[in-house]
Regions:
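Short, acidic/turn-prone active-site loops that include or flank metal/cofactor-
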Residues: 12, 71-75, 100-102
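Thr-Gly-centered strand-to-loop micro-motif
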Residues: 46-48, 69-72, 96-99, 204
Length: 209
């Protein structure tokens, strides 16, 4: 009635998939249970999608459904590793999530590091197939920041006319090392996940911290 956005789970683990199949035997796949009730639409967010096959992913792309990738939760609950590389290659909208229940931390830097680690494991156990290539540091950082921002209609990065949403990070508090290139500094910030590096948080142009 109110066209509100919907957020739920999809194909998180084997037991959940079997449970949904038992509840809705008329649906061939998990995603069809949402479609049956009019919830499979643009703006819907589905968390996990660990076991979403090609057909389910295609249904997500065509409907404009987003993926909330929660690697830390998926590891903690031994659900598996989501096919993030395939999702990105197929044009799905993906952003990182912490999962307040199954995840160990709310930090998006931690989520980015976990996403990289999980994707490397998937890449290795796939036999290092190119279509399962692991996430790079810039890709994971993008998924933790600008990717989610686009869900709310803002352009990626800093665009003229958009409200400013930013976090100011200062890596001088981290242990000294040899001189680092900008890409190496970003990598260290992500893997260190040290709250001391956060100097300011700005939302809609207003400084919160």
């Amino acid at each position: 009635e109110y066209e509100l956005p919907v957020q739920s789970h999809l194909s998180e683990n084997d037991a959940e998939i079997e449970w949904v199949r038992a509840l809705h035997p008329d649906c061939a796949q998990y995603w069809e249970t949402y479609a049956k009730f009019g919830l499979w639409k643009r703006g819907t967010i589905m968390a996990h999608c660990v076991h979403s096959d090609a057909r389910e992913r295609a249904a997500m792309r065509s409907a404009g459904v987003w993926v909330a990738h929660s690697p830390d939760s998926n590891t903690n609950l031994y659900s598996g590793v989501a096919p993030v590389r395939k999702m990105l290659s197929e044009g799905l909208s993906v952003a990182l999530a912490s999962d307040v229940a199954g995840g160990a931390k709310l930090s998006m830097l931690h989520a980015a590091a976990e996403a990289i680690r999980a994707s490397k494991l998937r890449y290795y156990y796939s036999g290092k197939r190119p279509d399962e290539a692991y996430l790079t540091v810039p890709e994971a950082f993008y998924l933790a920041t600008s990717a989610g921002q686009q869900y709310f209609g803002a352009g990626p990065g800093f665009c003229v006319g958009d409200s400013l949403h930013a976090i100011v990070l200062d890596d001088s508090v981290l242990p000294p090392s040899r001189p680092l290139a900008p890409a190496e500094r970003l990598e260290r910030l992500i893997y260190a996940d040290d709250s001391r590096t956060i100097r300011a948080v700005i939302s809609e142009g207003r400084r919160l911290i």
